A protein has these predicted regions:
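Juxta-kinase regulatory segment immediately upstream of eukaryotic protein kinase catalytic domains
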Residues: 2-33
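ATP-binding pocket architecture of kinase catalytic cores
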Residues: 36-143
Length: 143
C-alpha cells in the first residue's frame, strides 16, 4: 500500500500551475529560497495538493488549496501555516515555514512554502509495515 501513496509523480494537469509565476513571486517578495527549477506532486494526501519543489539542489514543499469553488473554512492552508509557524520555537518537531501567500492570482489558490523534511509516512493507521518492537516505540511516543 505504501508505494501507491509514497513518493512523487508528475503534476496532474488539473493541479498544475505556472512555475514562472511562482518564481517571479518568490523573487518579488524576497522569500529566502532559490528559484524553483522543478515541481513534482506528492502521490499521497487527501485534501490539499502538496508539491515537492526543487531549486539549486534544495527541496521545499508547497501546499495549496485545491482549485474550484470551496467552502470558506475548508482547506485552510493559512491555518496550517500559522499552526506550523507557531510551533517553530517549541519542542515539537516541525518544518521551517518560509511564506504564506493569500493571493489566489499567483498560482490559482492560496498556498504556503515550507522546508522539506525527509521521513517515513505510515499510511496504515496501525503501522503494520514495521516490526512489532518499532511499532510499540512509535505508539509509546504518540502517548
Amino acid at each position: 500500500m505504501s508505494n501507491q501513496f509514497s513518493g512523487t509523480k508528475e503534476v496532474a494537469e488539473n493541479l498544475a500551475f505556472n512555475l514562472d509565476d511562482l518564481n517571479k513571486y518568490i523573487q518579488e517578495k524576497e522569500i529566502n529560497i532559490p528559484s524553483i527549477s522543478e515541481c513534482k506532486q506528492f502521490k499521497g494526501g487527501q485534501s490539499n495538493p502538496t508539491y515537492l519543489l526543487t531549486g539549486n539542489g534544495q527541496n521545499y514543499v508547497l501546499r495549496r488549496k485545491p482549485p474550484g469553488k470551496l467552502l470558506k473554512s475548508a482547506h485552510a492552508v493559512d491555518r496550517e501555516y500559522r499552526v506550523i509557524t507557531a510551533l517553530q520555537d517549541t519542542p515539537v518537531p516541525t518544518p521551517k515555514t518560509y511564506h504564506l501567500c493569500e493571493d489566489p492570482e499567483i498560482i490559482g489558490t492560496d498556498f504556503y512554502i515550507m522546508e522539506f523534511c525527509d521521513g517515513i509516512i505510515y499510511w496504515d493507521p496501525v503501522a503494520s509495515e514495521v516490526n512489532t518492537e518499532r511499532r510499540k516505540g512509535i505508539f509509546d511516543q504518540l502517548n
